[in-house]
Amino acid sequence: MSNNGSSPLVLWYNQLGMNDVDRVGGKNASLGEMITNLSGMGVSVPNGFATTADAFNQFLDQSGVNQRIYELLDKTDIDDVTQLAKAGAQIRQWIIDTPFQPELENAIREAYAQLSADDENASFAVRSSATAEDMPDASFAGQQETFLNVQGVDAVLVAVKHVFASLFNDRAISYRVHQGYDHRGVALSAGVQRMVRSDLASSGVMFSIDTESGFDQVVFITSAWGLGEMVVQGAVNPDEFYVHKPTLAANRPAIVRRTMGSKKIRMVYAPTQEHGKQVKIEDVPQEQRDIFSLTNEEVQELAKQAVQIEKHYGRPMDIEWAKDGHTGKLFIVQARPETVRSRGQVMERYTLHSQGKIIAEGRAIGHRIGAGPVKVIHDISEMNRIEPGDVLVTDMTDPDWEPIMKKASAIVTNRGGRTCHAAIIARELGIPAVVGCGDATERMKDGENVTVSCAEGDTGYVYAELLEFSVKSSSVETMPDLPLKVMMNVGNPDRAFDFACLPNEGVGLARLEFIINRMIGVHPRALLEFDDQEPQLQNEIREMMKGFDSPREFYVGRLTEGIATLGAAFYPKRVIVRLSDFKSNEYANLVGGERYEPDEENPMLGFRGAGRYVSDSFRDCFALECEAVKRVRNDMGLTNVEIMIPFVRTVDQAKAVVEELARQGLKRGENGLKIIMMCEIPSNALLAEQFLEYFDGFSIGSNAMTQLALGLDRDSGVVSELFDERNDAVKALLSMAIRAAKKQGKYVGICGQGPSDHEDFAAWLMEEGIDSLSLNPDTVVQTWLSLAELKK
């Protein structure tokens, strides 16, 4: 397959490796690298061959078309859209009209005959691989063409010709000029690869790192039905999975979070082929939309392949995968360096200071906030309407949109997931984007001012009006030593990977309420008694629990995912999870909750915390929480997760709740389990030594302790000004608790708001000898550095 003994015109993938980027481009070199080096490690890549850069250059040279191309490009003003479009179209037509040199055509025919020998009906993907395309510093996101379901050698030859021509797409020409690449220095290789029949199954994209935070201990997988182009283009909202690498390495269940996408359409093979019509897009049946497109076992298998690929390349990777619908086998069809996340030492924290009316919501890309007037763009022909600072609102984007995307203050799309084109480019440009909103183009109106917030977790929100927000930057190399541990309070698992990148020594308070409220939203009793609910309520709950086998499994499974995400994000550091501390009015606000909750005058002092856990009316609901903790600790092996019991009023109640935990399979000391008590009622401090007999330590809740010590309601505007954790009475109680724990050699920390708000209070706690301060994430760095200054 060479040219009269000179350099080869066609090479098989198993002849290639990363040293061949100059010959076959990054994409093809990477496929060869994996076939050659990773096949024995469980990484499956479909076989194929590649035309070389030499073949491309000879094709242009022998025909003389290269002179015409470069002369035309040299006199074209590529910033003039009309000139660029005219020149690009002319160049592509020249290439398509130029016949292949006989040596190249024969080499392709010969390779095709070998590749299709076992199946004359086999179909192939013909993809471009530019010699500079997948360099780590250049994300040429999809600038050249891909042809799918190509059958027969003549169709392959036509597709290769179109791939060659795609090196001169308008966007590719523009990108090279702006990035400083010489047109003459970039060549194109066409990869011809046996297709995986994912049109009959599912496919998607995965990253060996969390794309939003740069957290490198998880694999992030997206998946949808049909061929993978829909996920890559952002035409569907895919399913999402996070897999924890250390747990996976221990051969334990390692999926820490699953999110079901709508998956409304899919790309499949067209029944009768015409050129350019080898595939078609169709609606996905409702029953397939309502289930995950991968099993848990398949998710774990893909994650293992991602880890092997990352380990081999020695860097985070962006990987496309496909499942064969005939055999059920999982294949890797592309792998390239992950181009976006190289997290520096400077951290930015965006904070929204007020919340307005929500106009649209979708998947948050990045953690920034942007604001400005809306421009709804329905078609690329309208791109000249975008002014710098506008909020770009559209159905979805493709690489043709890049020139206007960089002008936008934020991007909002109807369709797409975290690995779609709009998401990749938004990350690259550092612009906040909310993708997969469904109907943003209908709900948002041209000219209206909006604020686009990606600073609130996985969900991004578009708010009416321009809202006030701030950004804090902090540069952190290494943090100074302190005589205590600086931990943090985390409620939202969506933010856990991001917060884990801050300096920290674990989580002193992880609240279960956020998980129950946002990830579940249904009263546990309504799920346990699902069959007794009204049909309308049953339908509402069924809609919420898609992807789970039963109402009970929905509650336990979602809790497990939330707790596991927190445990995995900070692993192996300590993560203290406080079991549910909803008050009766808060439980009543959950779907189906009203019929099960008492109407209390003062829920703050009512049916809550430990008293709820041991009551006959709630005991089996509490058992669901215990089951989730057991799965996280015993099945997944995240034994860094400890549990904390809130609002323990009496010593008898302390004894009863520890006995109940043991009955539920959470026995203190077993498998290293530590049980911490929330010290937040004056009785807890006054009888600290007696309470500590049943627990492994205290975590001081200074908010409740202050309210109860001073007898005030801090939510009442009339008396709230008296609320101060630094009051002498409160400090006396805290001193008692700290001394009692120290005397018994047990842990004592604080997780209340006080040390986050008042650095002098944090300093006092340090002098008292407290073991840890658990702070709000936005105050960790500043408080840590301030305390270090005081110690000097």
Description of each model-found segment:
Residues 1-191, 200, 286-297, 302, ...:
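N-terminal beta-alpha lobe that positions the nucleotide/phosphoryl donor
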Residues 34-38, 210-213, 407, 423-431, ...:
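Alpha-helix C-terminal capping segments
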Residues 66, 326, 338-343, 347, ...:
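Acidic, glycine-rich flexible loop/linker segments
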Residues 112, 120-125, 130-140, 147-148, ...:
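Conserved alpha/beta-domain cores
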Residues 141-174, 198-273, 333-363, 407-414, ...:
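Extended active-site and interfacial segments that coordinate phosphate-rich ligands
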Residues 142, 314-339:
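Conserved metal-phosphate-binding beta-hairpin within the catalytic cores
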Residues 218-318, 323-324, 363-370, 388, ...:
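Conserved catalytic alpha/beta cores of large enzymes that bind or transform nucleotide phosphates
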